[in-house]
């Protein structure tokens, strides 16, 4: 349930049970993973809650990720690419970056954290191929976010916060007129 929140509040257990039972009763005709069920549950819950915006995190990668079924996002984010999930995503940083870059859609915008040179080249090539705009997280963006209270520990979380803030500013910037603290 901590994976699904609306306005900072976790989905109630009753809704997890109700939506989980609803989804388990459907014959999708394919084998779904736990991530697939959680994604479907989140989408149903967000629809019920009439969310204006959703932040959806991919599972392992990008290219073959279940989240691609949602369609073209207003903005995608690629965080720092490392060597995790090498058995699934690839044996070197360029292969892993190619998988992660699979979330870049035609004529879209993607916020990208600072990357290894090889990873960034792959991301830039994919963005160019898809006519996508890249917004790069800079040190000044990270510094601006350093005063935020984050729920997770680790210095890399400041980079993630900066990427999330840039994505929010991009998406909301077109329509947003509320107070600055709401973006934070």
Model-derived regions, located:
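Short intrinsically disordered, low-complexity coil segments enriched in acidic
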Residues: 1-8, 150-153, 184
């Amino acid at each position: 349930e901590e994976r699904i929140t609306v306005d900072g509040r976790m989905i109630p257990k009753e809704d997890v049970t109700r939506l989980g039972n609803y989804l388990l009763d459907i014959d999708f005709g394919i084998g779904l993973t736990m991530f697939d069920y959680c994604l479907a549950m989140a989408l149903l819950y967000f629809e019920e809650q009439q969310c204006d915006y959703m932040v959806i995190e991919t599972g392992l990668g990008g290219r073959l990720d279940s989240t691609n079924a949602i369609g073209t996002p207003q903005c995608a984010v690629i965080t720092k690419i490392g060597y995790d999930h090498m058995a699934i995503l690839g044996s070197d940083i360029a292969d892993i970056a190619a998988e992660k870059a699979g979330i870049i859609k035609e004529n879209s915008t993607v916020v990208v954290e600072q990357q290894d040179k090889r990873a960034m080249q792959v991301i830039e090539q994919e963005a160019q191929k898809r006519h996508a705009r890249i917004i790069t997280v800079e040190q000044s963006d990270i510094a601006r976010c350093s005063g935020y209270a984050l729920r997770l520990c680790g210095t890399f979380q400041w980079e993630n916060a900066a990427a999330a803030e840039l994505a929010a500013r991009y998406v909301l910037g077109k329509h947003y007129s509320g107070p600055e603290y709401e973006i934070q």
